[in-house]
Amino acid sequence: MPILTQRSARVRDARKLTRRQGRAKAGLFLAEGPQAVREALAATARQRPGLVTDLFASPPAATRYADIVDAALAAGVSVHHADEPALAALSETMTPQGLVAVCRLLSVPLDAALDGAPHLVAILAEARDPGNAGTVIRSADAAGADAVVLTRGSVDPHGGKSVRASAGSVFHLPICADADLETTIAAARARGLHVLAADGAGDLDLDEAEATGLLARPTAWLFGNEARGLPSTARELADEVVRVPIYGRAESLNLATAAAVCMYASARVQRRVR
């Protein structure tokens, strides 16, 4: 098998996917590292044939992760050996692990993301930090959420930092990107979801929300921008505004931590009452 370099056409085309514009134009994104690639291939085998189109592997990585290469070949994925500089050009990390998969974009329409009878949904309103977005997706997956929606003005969940921070969870649950905020809230409510906005100035704290039975209801949690918090529209349209209680001296929690606390609080109560 020939070894591709940075000048190879396939590598040059794949490198365009490190930018949001390139991903949108091609309808593709990159998943880097063995964990992400394994989950992408598992999703391909489980329910999304054709999700992974290509796999780039350095010769050492192809040997070290022979099981991943074999799974890719079995799924009909085009496997390419590439040298270390080529893999580094496709990576956004300081220490590339030698495996990069090219995948089809995951974002689905809002109706598809909220299909069925969802019990727990996370909505990110104008979240800009890719690491936070990926971590929220990971936490939503761990809490058993049915979907994650990112509204217009939010970071692209297909970016390298978001995909890495999700630790493969982007392949586990429906994700809708670039959704209209008001339309999203209306759609969530139409599916019987109680819309709770997480905000440090909320009228209720999370303990009170649990004590009153609020968390037992099917819920869409709204989380805002890391610096500015929730858009005023989100606060106005939410059914309740809830704050995470701070028992110590910390000024606040960051977005990803607050989201994990809120979603797990809902998941724990919902699992008891189902």
Which residues does each PLM region occupy?
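Generic beta-sheet signal
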Residues: 99, 119-122, 217-224
